[in-house]
Amino acid sequence: MQVSPAIVKGIAVSSLGLYAGILTSSTVISITTPINVLTQHLKNVLCTLGCWSTVLGGLATGAFGLSYYLAAPGERPNYLLCGLGVAPLSAAYLYLVSLFNHKLAPKCTRDQNDLEKQKDEKLPQHHPEVKDGEAACPFSKMNNAKTLKPESERSVKCHSYMSLHMSIVTGITIFTFGKCILDGFKA
């Protein structure tokens, strides 16, 4: 069974587009939302979304790899190989950065400046007001009326560290997505 090059290109661009979109939206949410809202009100929702996004990205990358493998050897576009590795490599990189950040987090001291920055962070425009100990996210059944353990909270410094790495990976993913599309027009 052989797959035509057009189908391989279509699956490749769809897979990369899906992954780039998921990563971009996650990065924008992480950067624009104050850390106290992320950790106290949206943590479980974002973790669930992250798990399902990983599964969806894995399935799309698997379909891409399978279609590439099933294509005739002479009709496999080489420029798509870099796109095939983006999702697994960036997911592994972000996972390792996250593990390092969790190990580093207890060492990230929460000095008074960090606490003041966290309290002064503004919500995005038109966002309903969220106060500590008040209205948890309605979509997170597991988080309602629960308080987080003090050791699970992150300082502003540790949060910005993770946001920086997410931004870098998002930029690389979008660049690779654009490159695969533009190289597809040349081929």
From Swiss-Prot:
Residues 114-135 are annotated as: Disordered. The chain crosses the membrane at residues 11-31, 45-65, 80-100, 162-182. The keyword Cell division does not apply. It is a multi-pass membrane protein. One of its GO terms (biological process) is autophagy of mitochondrion. One of its GO terms (cellular component) is mitochondrion. It is found in: Membrane. InterPro entries: ATG33 (IPR051668). Keywords: Membrane, Transmembrane, Transmembrane helix. Residues 114-134 have a biased composition (Basic and acidic residues). Present with 3210 molecules/cell in log phase SD medium. Belongs to the ATG33 family. This is Protein SCM4. It comes from Saccharomyces cerevisiae (strain ATCC 204508 / S288c). The lineage of its organism: Eukaryota, Fungi, Dikarya, Ascomycota, Saccharomycotina.
